């Protein structure tokens, strides 16, 4: 049996925070605002995985009203989600992600992101795709106010 999940997330830029995307710290003058470390890509992947097994979203499992998740490492949150997915009897088929950002350029960091995500999801890097695009200076990402991401995951019964 196969299950498909889709995830989407957005975070706003702010001064004085690190920029962490896909589990990788990226040099930039601003980071993203969030209750956790605001890793927009890992949040998107978690939502896609949870959606594939009809288990809600990241906010249901790690609410931003719970102080236990304040400044949480999104890699740890994704590991917990992945453990839950595996407990339901699923493994990863493949994952395809898109980061939507005007700046900074993501290309130099894509392979590091793929490697980190493959580690977190206990799979071959060949099952992980990460790409980036801009909105040609349109909308909030084009105005460099934040970053968005999308992901689609295919899970299969073990």
Swiss-Prot record:
Binds 1 divalent metal cation per subunit. Pathway: Isoprenoid biosynthesis; isopentenyl diphosphate biosynthesis via DXP pathway; isopentenyl diphosphate from 1-deoxy-D-xylulose 5-phosphate: step 4/6. 4-CDP-2-C-methyl-D-erythritol 2-phosphate binds at residues 9-11, 35-36, 57-59, 62-66, 101-107, 133-136, 140, 143. It comes from the Bacteria. Its cofactor is a divalent metal cation. One of its GO terms (biological process) is terpenoid biosynthetic process. This is 2-C-methyl-D-erythritol 2,4-cyclodiphosphate synthase. The lineage of its organism: Bacteria, Bacillati, Bacillota, Bacilli, Bacillales.
């Amino acid at each position: 049996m196969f299950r498909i999940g889709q995830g989407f997330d957005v975070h706003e830029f702010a001064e004085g925070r690190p920029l962490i995307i896909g589990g990788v710290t990226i040099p930039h003058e601003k980071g993203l605002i969030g209750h956790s470390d605001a890793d927009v890509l890992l949040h998107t992947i978690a939502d896609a995985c949870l959606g594939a097994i009809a288990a809600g979203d990241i906010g249901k499992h790690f609410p931003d009203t719970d102080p236990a998740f304040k400044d949480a490492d999104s890699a740890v949150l994704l590991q917990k989600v992945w453990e839950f997915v595996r407990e339901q009897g699923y493994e990863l088929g493949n994952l395809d992600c898109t980061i939507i950002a005007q700046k900074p350029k993501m290309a130099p960091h894509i392979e590091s992101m793929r490697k980190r995500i493959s580690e977190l999801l206990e799979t071959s890097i060949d099952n992980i795709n990460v790409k980036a695009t801009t909105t040609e200076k349109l909308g909030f990402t084009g105005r460099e106010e934040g970053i968005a991401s999308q992901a689609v995951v295919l899970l299969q019964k073990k």
